[in-house]
Amino acid sequence: AIVRQLVALGYTVNGWSRSAHAVDGMAMFTGPAAFDDFLAVTDVLICVLPLTDATRGILGRRTFGGLPRGAAIVNCGRGEHLVANDLLGALDSGQLRGAVLDVFAQEPLPADDPLWRAPGVVVTPHMATMASSAVVAEQVAHNVRRLVAGEPLAHVVDMGRGY
């Protein structure tokens, strides 16, 4: 949904994934070896990754340093992706110009957290996606129909991958 909306607005969209797959309208970078190349051409990094041992802390000094100077980040994935002190340092140095943060390691974000006062940071109340009850009901009904038909369920968590 994010890709479709950005492409419709005329943006060039690049994506990075652990494994190869195609997404219409998006140039894909695949695997750990392509991560630095992906970062180098990313002006606004939108993180929607699942939380795994490999992605915990991914929004930190190394990632920020790989982005073009003056880039921005949006985190609507998981709060544990972000290393807050690294973000504050990247903002102070000008490496990043801003951040929109919708998720936090501790929610609600404590009133005295420096992210509230950091220049260039927009804090939102974990609302990047608000699924309507009708959408949720349809997803459940879809899986019930699949179960009754003896088909594999959709959106099953792979415990080996962690998502």
Identify the residue ranges that each predicted region occupies.
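Internal, well-ordered alpha-helical segments in soluble enzyme and binding-protein domains
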Residues: 1-2, 12
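Aromatic pocket-lining residues of Rossmann-like dinucleotide-binding sites
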Residues: 2, 6, 67
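Short alpha-helical functional segments enriched in proximate histidine and acidic residues
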Residues: 5, 9, 41, 143, ...
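NAD(P)-binding Rossmann-fold cofactor-contacting core
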Residues: 7-25
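Conserved beta-strand segments of alpha/beta enzyme cores
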Residues: 12, 27, 97-98, 120-122
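Rossmann-like adenosine-cofactor binding region
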Residues: 19-114
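C-terminal helix-to-coil terminal segments
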Residues: 22, 107-163
